[in-house]
Amino acid sequence: MEDLHVIAVCILALTVLSGVGAVLSCCRWCCSNPFPPSLSSVQAKDSRSVRETIKNIEGASAQ
């Protein structure tokens, strides 16, 4: 019966250590990678590129 307690404690310790390792690796990955740009800045860049493309097409058709 005492052996079962030892096995249970070992399994519990391995589970806790695995969880802690997963959390730490996730935190390390999140801190090392830059966060993605906000949606408004992406939309602003897209609208500028669309306007530039339209100007280029209009300029090419005028020539």
Swiss-Prot record:
The lineage of its organism: Viruses, Riboviria, Orthornavirae, Kitrinoviricota, Tolucaviricetes. It comes from the Viruses. InterPro entries: BYDV_Gp6 (IPR009426). It comes from Barley yellow dwarf virus (isolate PAV). This is Uncharacterized protein ORF6.
